[in-house]
Structure formats: C-alpha cells, structure tokens
C-alpha cells in the first residue's frame, strides 16, 4: 500500500483497522541474541583487550587510547563554528529550564499523630550515555541526556560512542559537563558500561539509542544481576498527526517527512476527518520528498505509513490513543482542546508553529521518548529517570502505640509471626516502662 492511498477508517472491518495500526515488525534474531551474549561475556572477562578487538572488527579502527583526552576535546571545539556552538547553548538553556522545573518537593507528612512519613529523592550515582556514530552524529541526544543528569546531581556521567567520535558529540559532552568520553561503540560499549573494564567505569544505569545490537545488549544487561538498569525499551521512530481542514498541508507533510527520514523502519500516520486534506498532504509529501537528500530511505518508511480519513476529530483522538504514538502532532483550529482526551503519547505538539523538530532540539522537552506502543505504560525521559525516590518513617512512642494493635492484627492474618513479634516485644517494653 503506497502512502498516497487514502483509507476510509469507517469502511474498514475491525481486523483491517487493527492491521492499519500495526507497526513494522522488530525482533532480535537468534543470531543477534547469541552474538550480543558472547560480546557481553567476552568484555566482562577480558575488558579493554576485548573492546579493542571489537573496534578493529566492527568499526575498522585501531584504538590505542580508549579514553578521549582533554586535548582532543579542545581541538574538536576549535573546529566547530561559533554559530553551532551558540545554537547548542540555546538548546541546553531550554532543556535545563524545563528539566529543572521537574524537581519534586520533598514529601513530609504525619499520617497520624506521632507517625511521620517522608519521601526524598536522591540521584542515580553513576550513569552511562551511549551515542551512536555514523554519518549523522546525534549530538542533540548528548544534550538531552547529559543535561538532566547534571541537574539530578549524578556524581559520575560518562559517554561512549563509536570511533572516530564526531566533533559535535565531543563538544556537546564538554558543554554538558560529561566527565569522561570513551572511543567504544556497539554492544561492546554497553557491556563496558554495565560491567566495567580497566578504562571504562561500571555505571548504575545506561541511557541512549542504538542499532539492533545495542538495543539487544541493553535488554540483556538489564536482566542480569551483575548488569545495569536502562532508560526504556527502544523501537523505530514514529509520528502521528491529527489535522483538520484548517491545517496547512505543507506543514503537515514536512512533519511527516521529518520523522520518516530517520530510517526505513520509521512509521508516520495522518488522521483527518477531511478527505481533501489527506489528498493535499499526499501531494505535498511527494513535492517535498523529491528535494530530500535522504529520499530513498524516507520513501521506504512511507511504505509502512498511513493516510486515514475519520468521521470526526473525536474519532481521531480515539484512534491515536489506541496507537499510542511516540510523537503526536495536533494541527487543528483548537488544538489544545484535544489534549485532555489524549491518554497515550510520548510528546505532543500543538498548533501550526510547533513542529516536531522543536522538541527534537530546542523547545526544552526531552526527545528521548517511548516508541512502539510503550506510551501505554512508559513516559518521556525526564529528571526522574536520573533519580530514585526513598521513603523515611519515624514513629514516636505514642505513634507506635496507636498503630501497634493494627500491625499485630495484619501480621497475624498473613501468618508472619516474626513481623508480629517485632511489634509485640516493643509493646511489652512500653508496658513495663509505664
């Protein structure tokens, strides 16, 4: 089905509707699973030596120093334009402002007289950031990960990226106070961060996107007792646009294409109650696609994408919630009025002047988002992902006495005698002191 095929949602059967909202299949093949498992075990056992071997094998690079020196980072900074540096600074300021506002006030309450309960936050002590390499280095992801890590107060923030590391990534790391950067990529980088090597420190939590091997490595280390926690499950990029007859077709098309160009497994969907809008967007997509340098990749993504005509905007919202997009763009006359009805989306963009690109780079929200339907249970990355909550309770004698019989009754009902005894012993001491 080509992208310019306009589909009438209400003419489809329930099964056809289900098929329309299916995402491109992703699964780690058995060979990827086995390969990644071998890489993890090898790096855990042989450390830096294994990292250098994998760099030669996969990156075709001889790495002498795994850690990037301060001189190399300074040289990278010198090679970048002032314009790009200024743009990064503006983006960091926006990200910093939004994520600082996410700080939670401490909770401190008396649940009843003499029973004080608190909730406090503490930073994750050490985090590792993974940034893919390639022809289009994702330096913006450095800003999105390192900025909240700094605000949260993480004591150790390190970064891994395949060699040779782009100047933009090195400068972004410096700008955001990343302490150490390492010339290591792929599943072996995830292994190094999870287990530690002679050069790369073991971290508590790993963040960042990657290919199928990186994604599988993150999954595996998160399930190993000696591994590390991870940010969230990863999948291909996606966007869903809700547009009415008042939307600008060229704007809608540009937003769809900006997501489709990420890769052939990306998916874009347009929902509109206006069939003419769907037709005009399809025409605009074809015009703009012809001008894109990544047109071939983008066209592959469009093969799994949809133009869907609905009964009304309420049905658009219903379908969007069923799909749960990573990015949701609402280009309608009264876009904000639809927000209360949205239950599942990674990040929402309202109105003609809120392109997804703004959130990808500089509006301040985080561009690390749940994909592949995980918006039903997962949230966009935020300050909380770099922190942990801890509860504190303190009972006075009076507070303990008031709760004692309740605790004893509940513990006895669950047949946890030692739990009950921990209370009864104290009750008896209080009786003796009386």
UniProtKB/Swiss-Prot annotation:
Keyword Oxidoreductase annotated: yes
Record field: catalytic activity: L-histidinol + 2 NAD(+) + H2O = L-histidine + 2 NADH + 3 H(+)
GO cellular component, one term: cytosol
UniProt remark on cofactor binding: Binds 1 zinc ion per subunit.
Binding site for NAD(+): 130, 188, 211
Enzyme class: oxidoreductase
Sites where the protein binds Zn(2+): 259, 262, 360, 419
Residues the record lists as binding substrate: 237, 259, 262, 327, 360, 414, 419
Keyword Amino-acid biosynthesis: yes
Coiled coil region boundaries: none
Pathway annotation: Amino-acid biosynthesis; L-histidine biosynthesis; L-histidine from 5-phospho-alpha-D-ribose 1-diphosphate: step 9/9
Superkingdom classification of source: Bacteria
EC number: 1.1.1.23
GO BP term, example: L-histidine biosynthetic process
Necessary cofactors: Zn(2+)
Keywords, comma-separated and alphabetical: Amino-acid biosynthesis, Histidine biosynthesis, Metal-binding, NAD, Oxidoreductase, Zinc
UniProt cross-references to InterPro entries, sorted A to Z: Ald_DH/histidinol_DH, Histidinol_DH_CS, Histidinol_DH_monofunct, Hstdl_DH
Catalytic-site annotation from UniProt: 326 (proton acceptor), 327 (proton acceptor)
GO molecular function: histidinol dehydrogenase activity; NAD binding; zinc ion binding
Subunit structure, as described in the record: Homodimer.
Function: Catalyzes the sequential NAD-dependent oxidations of L-histidinol to L-histidinaldehyde and then to L-histidine.
Stated family: Belongs to the histidinol dehydrogenase family.
Name the UniProt record assigns to this protein: Histidinol dehydrogenase
Source organism of this protein record: Shigella flexneri
């Amino acid at each position: 089905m080509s992208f310019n095929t306009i589909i009438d949602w209400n003419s489809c059967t329930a099964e056809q509707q289900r098929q329309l909202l299916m995402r491109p299949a992703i699964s780690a093949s058995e060979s990827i699973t086995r390969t990644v498992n071998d890489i993890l075990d090898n790096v855990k056992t042989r450390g830096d030596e294994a990292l250098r071997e994998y760099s030669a094998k996969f990156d075709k690079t001889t790495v002498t120093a795994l850690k990037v020196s301060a001189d190399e980072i300074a040289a990278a900074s010198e090679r970048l334009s002032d314009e790009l540096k200024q743009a990064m600074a503006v983006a960091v300021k926006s990200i910093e402002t939004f994520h600082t506002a996410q700080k939670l006030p401490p909770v401190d309450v008396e649940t009843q007289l003499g029973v004080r309960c608190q909730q406090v936050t503490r930073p994750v002590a050490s985090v590792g950031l993974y940034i893919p390499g390639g022809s289009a280095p994702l330096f913006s992801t450095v800003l999105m990960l390192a900025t909240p890590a700094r605000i949260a107060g993480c004591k150790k923030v390190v970064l891994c990226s395949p060699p040779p590391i782009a100047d933009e990534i090195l400068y972004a790391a410096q700008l955001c106070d990343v302490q150490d950067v390492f010339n290591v990529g792929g599943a072996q980088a995830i292994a190094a961060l999870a287990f530690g090597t002679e050069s790369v420190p073991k971290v508590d939590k790993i963040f960042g996107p990657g290919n199928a091997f990186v994604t599988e490595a993150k999954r595996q280390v998160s399930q190993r007792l000696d591994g590390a926690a991870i940010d969230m499950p990863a999948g291909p990029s996606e966007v869903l646009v809700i547009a009415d007859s008042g939307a600008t077709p060229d704007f809608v098309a540009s937003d769809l294409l900006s997501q489709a160009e990420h890769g052939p497994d990306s998916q874009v969907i347009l929902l509109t109650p206006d069939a003419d809008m769907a037709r005009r967007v399809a025409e605009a997509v074809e015009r703009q696609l012809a001008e894109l340098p990544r047109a071939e990749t983008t066209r592959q993504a469009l093969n799994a994408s949809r133009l869907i005509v609905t009964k009304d905007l309420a049905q658009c919202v219903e379908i969007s919630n069923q799909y749960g997009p990573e990015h949701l763009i609402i280009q309608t006359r009264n876009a904000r009025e639809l927000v209360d009805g949205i239950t599942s989306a990674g990040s929402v963009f309202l109105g003609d002047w809120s392109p997804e690109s703004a959130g990808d780079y500089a509006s301040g929200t985080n561009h690390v988002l749940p994909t592949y339907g995980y918006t039903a249970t997962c949230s966009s990355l935020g300050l909380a992902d770099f922190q942990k909550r801890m509860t504190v309770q303190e009972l006075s004698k009076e507070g303990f006495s008031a709760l004692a019989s309740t605790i004893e009754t509940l513990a006895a009902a669950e047949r946890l005698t030692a739990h009950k005894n921990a209370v009864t012993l104290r009750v008896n001491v209080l009786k003796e002191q009386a």
